[in-house]
């Protein structure tokens, strides 16, 4: 018997939703509420492939959910709100408390709130969505799916920082990692495409979008990942610096007179591709600029690819080899150029990739880009975090 599951991603003033029929993983509709709590909020829903947009004031997330449910009935997507069988909520930080997704109870809600100090921008916003759905749909299971949960299998040697140990014990300072739902989805899909048990595979997953992280997945479990205590760590990103020498922060403060908060803002929002190029955080813009001879744009692309390339080598060493390299997310799925730069020179590791196949895979296409004889397979997989969320609602919401 099919179930209708809502996959939800709530921001402080936004609410993204997808209604998915399970277990078929068929998208029924999707949409977005923007500018919640502001004047002229925008509600967009997809009906028969067309976007239907309305502008009205929406005061809070409860009203946003109410409007969404009304739209479902108005457009005959559902007959009654009781047709919805469960909801799944993306929650950015689950800390060490949540090594897997969890059915939401009052206790779980309280624990998500307590973890807000680890994700002050995201967890409170995710909670707004959870509370709105629990209020309006009280009789169905609601499940929290944590970005950090997949990486809770990392061993101590991967997640501990070389700081006084009591900082970890007292304040929870350690590597947590993010994009877990995406890494989990593409690693499972890669195993399906290879027709091999995931337990037998060593996978390096490259989630490369405006935010980017690399994960080492051994036997289906994350054993290391590039992001850290926050999503600022790791590789160069659209506007984030990735790893830097921590002593740079007081040095920049001294040289510029900026506060620690201001420097952190620069590292999060003015660095990465944007900071290096001085023009854009968008890879497409930088590729065009590089082609027209802008040296700084080319340099930004080279730095970006080089950091990812380095992590692949590092994680191959961590797993004593690699069987599959996966590219996913906006840049990973679409940038022929970045994939080529990242893979360049990896033949010593058994990576032999086909430039023609690489050229053909973009705009949501899935497939292998390695030569048949390549010991290491290279695959492009469009990520689908919403389907992963819906799967977890079925499992943890007791709907299977």
From Swiss-Prot:
PROSITE patterns: ACETATE_KINASE_1 (PS01075), ACETATE_KINASE_2 (PS01076). Mg(2+) binds at residues 9, 385. SUPFAM superfamilies: Actin-like ATPase domain (SSF53067). Substrate binds at residue 90. It is found in: Cytoplasm. PANTHER family: ACETATE KINASE, ACETATE KINASE-RELATED. This is Acetate kinase. The lineage of its organism: Bacteria, Bacillati, Bacillota, Bacilli, Bacillales.
